[in-house]
């Protein structure tokens, strides 16, 4: 796969409650010891790491995944040329990668993560 899925995310109104739910449901070890209280789920043997937390706008929430790419701006331009739209321009995550988000033509929101960052 030339652009692997590298992260999943579950975001909702009550990040702490979601972290407790998924921790108990799947026995995940979730570390939310960071300024954003964003619960990091480390990858295990054959799995993919991710995060669980509260949304900035405290809206209904979302579930998404992040795809690794070399150039965020170039991929956002490609998204728009294919009928999608940029939802969040590139931004640096403290202690993590540079990320961006887009919506496909049907409105599904997908994340991009810069390769080699974070």
Q: What is each PLM-predicted segment?
A:
Residues 25-30, 83-85:
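Conserved acetyl-CoA-binding loop of GNAT-fold acetyltransferases
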Residues 22:
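Catalytic core of tubulin tyrosine ligase-like
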């Amino acid at each position: 796969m030339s652009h692997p899925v590298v992260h999943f995310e579950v975001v909702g109104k009550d990040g702490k409650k979601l972290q407790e739910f998924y921790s108990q449901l799947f026995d995940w070890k979730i570390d939310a010891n960071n300024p954003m209280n964003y619960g990091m789920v480390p990858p295990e043997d054959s799995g993919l790491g991710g995060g669980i937390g509260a949304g900035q706008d405290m809206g209904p929430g979302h579930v998404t995944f992040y795809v690794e790419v070399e150039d965020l701006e170039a991929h956002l331009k490609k998204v728009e040329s294919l009928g999608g739209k940029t939802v969040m321009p590139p931004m640096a995550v403290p202690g993590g990668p540079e990320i961006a988000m887009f919506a496909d033509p049907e409105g599904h929101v997908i994340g991009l993560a810069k390769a080699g960052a974070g």
